[in-house]
Amino acid sequence: MDLSEFAEEIGSETPVSIAGLATRGGPVDGIQTVMAPVGVEWVQPEEMTVRCGAGTPVEELDDALAASGQCVAIPPTGTVGGALAVAHSGIRRLGYGPVRDTVLQAGYVNAGGEVVKAGGPTVKNVSGFDLCRLLVGSRGTLGFIGDVILRTRPRAAYEQWFTTTADPFELFPRLYRPTSVLWDGVTTWILLEGHPRDVDEQATRHGLTIGENPILPSGGRWSIRPAELPGLVGTGDFVAEIGVGVVHHADPAPVRAVDPAVAELHRRLKREFDPTGRLNPGVDVLSAT
């Protein structure tokens, strides 16, 4: 995908921000706002890879992959680039892994207005892979992603949410490859995928009941240690992702002090990638949840 026009729009001098579908923010007053290229360039089912513009809505990408019976491990909200920028893995992270592992190659524009390619186009080629990982979750402060090559996965033949009142911490180790395990202090939701017979057999073995999709509180996304999860009971409405360390809470995430070593590493990275601070000015990556 040709990113020359995208790079020209970004330029190399004045402050600039990037926006997707405005699901996590929109244009900033007084600052030029750009949008990443849109569209699926190609799908290679035999290689289980796909290339698309970072501005492509995830739902559009899913539709393009449906014909080959594949999908990507990115939640169907917003754009591909937006999900990568905020490292939004979604509630299937337990089974699908973190969203950063989906990226094989990224084409991005740096603070100097140059197009840079990181990573490789196939699953076997991991050249520059660490730089792709660095961009994921950086919220556009190190570079603006223009296009990506993503690893696809087979679309599940069958999936079903189940519920139980069993202790999730005792049940979780006994489950076989659950896609998601959620808990609100009373009810445990379990998402199982696979062959219908295998899913039903596991549900019967653990006494699970078919349930509705869980509704997540929209107040804040907390990151906590697994040992702290029982202490959430009584703190307000929440849904915790068991085995992941993420909690969707009705209240905003508590402010925590940033590790000085982490802060220093971030400053060094920012100084190397964007010395003038022109990319997404005002975005605080360290305080983001």
Regions found by a protein language model. Give the residues of each.
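N-terminal glycine-rich flavin-associated loop
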Residues: 1-16, 35-76, 88-121, 157-164
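Short active-site-proximal "capping" loops at secondary-structure junctions
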Residues: 21-25, 38-39, 146
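Conserved glycine-rich FAD pyrophosphate-binding loop
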Residues: 27, 185, 205-289
